[in-house]
From Swiss-Prot:
Annotated pathway: Cell wall biogenesis; peptidoglycan biosynthesis
UniProt keyword list: ATP-binding, Cell shape, Cell wall biogenesis/degradation, Cytoplasm, Ligase, Magnesium, Manganese, Metal-binding, Nucleotide-binding, Peptidoglycan synthesis
Enzyme class: ligase
Reaction(s) catalysed by this chain's protein: 2 D-alanine + ATP = D-alanyl-D-alanine + ADP + phosphate + H(+)
CC cofactor note: Binds 2 magnesium or manganese ions per subunit.
Gene name per UniProt: ddl
Pfam families (alphabetical): Dala_Dala_lig_C, Dala_Dala_lig_N
Protein name: D-alanine--D-alanine ligase
Residues given in the record as Mg(2+) 1 binding sites: D284, E296
Keyword Metal-binding included in the entry's annotation: yes
Length: 345
C-alpha cells in the first residue's frame, strides 16, 4: 500500500505520535514515506530508514526536505524544481491537537488529498468530551452523568465523591486525576486547567468493567477488532495507556458473553455510522449490569490499535481503497453574468 504517514503536530501528545509512527513502521515495514509535523507546524519528509526517536529528539529532522502543500499532495523544492512525495493516500497519525481536532483534516480536504482518518465534523465532535456526550445521546448510546467546570467560573460541585476529572479537549489520559474529597478536587481541577480552559467531571465507578473495541466500515461492512479488557489498578493513566501501546504482540480476547459482545458492537455502529467513514477508530466502553456506557471515542488510537486486529495490514489496505468521495462542485459563473446583465454592467 502506498501510504504517507503524517505524525507529530503542535500537541501535548506530540511525542506519543512519534512513538505511534515508529511502532506502525514495525508492523508495516513496506511503508516508505513519513511526513513529520514539528512544533512550528512545518512539514518534513522523513525516509523510513530515519524513523528513530533520536532523529526527532535531537532535531536531526531539520536536515530533511521541508514540504509544502499544493492541490493533490505534498511537495519539496529541489535543484531541478519541485518534487511531489509519491504516495496515494495519507494516514493521519497525529494524536491530540492538530490531528484529532480537525485541523489536519481541514488541510487535507482543502487540498484534495485522500486520507485515512476522521473528517472535520467527526474530529471536532470526538475531540471535545462534552460534544461527544451530546453526540452519543443523540445516537442512543448512554454515557455517565457529568459536570462541566471552566477555569474562571465559581466552582460548586456538591459533595459526591470520588470523581474523575479530565481536561475537556485532550487525550492519552494526560491531566486526568481522581478526586476523593474537596481538597483533591481543587487540585485535580488545577491540574486539568494546566492543559485546557475547561474540564469534565464524572463519577468514578469503582470496579466497573471497561472494554475497548476498534473497527471501521469498508464497502458497507464493519470490520471489528477483538474486544480488549484493559488491565488497570484504578484507571488507565498515561503510563499504562500510552507507554504500553507501542507493544506489537496480539492481545487475548476479553472474556465476554455473546450478548455483551453484541451490545458493544451495536453501540459502536451507532456511533460510527455516517460520521466516521474513512477512519479506523476505537471506542472505549463501560459495562455494568448488562448496560453499555460510552467512555470516549478515540478517532486516532495509538498505532491505530493494530495489536487488536487479526489482519491489520489487510484492513488498512482495504480502507485506503474505499475512502469517502468528496462531492464535486461545478463552478461556471453563470449567476455572476446574469447579475451583471441585470445591473447593466
Amino acid at each position: 500500500m502506498n501510504l504517507a504517514v503524517i505524525f507529530g503536530g503542535a500537541s501535548y501528545e506530540h511525542e506519543i505520535s512519534i512513538v505511534s509512527a515508529i511502532s506502525l513502521k514495525k508492523i508495516l515495514p513496506a511503508l516508505e514515506h513519513f511526513i513529520f509535523v514539528d512544533g512550528n507546524r512545518d512539514f518534513y519528509w522523513i525516509p523510513a530508514s530515519e524513523m528513530r526517536s533520536k532523529h526527532f529528539a535531537d532535531g536531526i529532522y531539520k536536515k530533511n526536505p521541508k514540504l509544502f502543500l499544493r492541490p493533490g499532495g505534498f511537495y519539496a523544492k529541489g535543484l531541478w524544481g519541485e518534487k511531489r512525495v509519491p504516495f496515494d493516500t495519507a494516514l493521519n497519525l497525529i494524536h491530540g491537537g492538530d490531528g484529532e481536532d480537525g485541523k489536519l483534516a481541514s488541510l487535507l480536504e482543502f487540498f484534495r488529498i485522500p486520507f485515512i482518518g476522521p473528517r472535520i465534523e467527526a474530529s471536532v465532535m470526538s475531540f471535545n468530551k462534552h460534544l461527544t456526550k451530546l453526540y452519543a445521546k443523540e445516537r442512543g448510546v448512554k454515557t455517565l452523568p457529568y459536570l462541566l467546570a471552566r477555569k474562571n467560573e465559581k466552582r460548586e460541585f456538591g459533595n459526591e465523591f470520588p470523581l474523575i476529572v479530565k481536561p475537556l479537549r485532550l487525550g492519552s489520559s494526560i491531566g486526568v486525576s481522581i478526586a476523593k474529597n474537596r481538597q483533591e478536587l481543587d487540585y485535580a481541577l488545577d491540574v486539568a486547567f494546566e492543559f485546557d480552559e475547561a474540564a469534565l467531571l464524572e463519577p468514578f465507578m469503582q470496579g466497573i468493567k471497561e472494554y475497548n473495541l476498534a473497527g471501521c466500515k469498508i464497502n458497507g461492512e464493519y470490520h471489528f477488532s477483538i474486544i480488549e479488557e484493559p488491565q488497570k489498578k484504578e484507571f488507565l493513566d498515561f503510563d499504562k495507556k500510552y507507554l504500553d501501546f507501542s507493544r506489537t504482540q496480539k492481545l487475548l480476547k476479553a472474556d465476554l458473553s455473546e450478548a455483551s459482545e453484541r451490545l458493544l458492537k451495536e453501540a459502536f455502529i451507532k456511533l460510527y455510522d455516517d460520521s466516521f467513514e474513512g477512519s479506523l477508530i476505537r471506542c472505549d466502553f463501560f459495562v455494568q449490569n448488562q448496560e453499555v456506557f460510552l467512555n470516549e471515542i478515540n478517532p486516532i488510537p495509538g498505532s491505530l490499535a493494530n495489536y487488536l486486529f487479526e489482519d491489520f495490514p489487510k484492513i488498512l489496505q482495504s480502507l485506503a481503497h474505499n475512502l469517502p468521495k468528496e462531492r464535486g462542485i461545478k463552478i461556471d459563473y453563470r449567476y455572476i453574468h446574469q447579475i451583471q446583465k441585470a445591473k447593466g454592467k
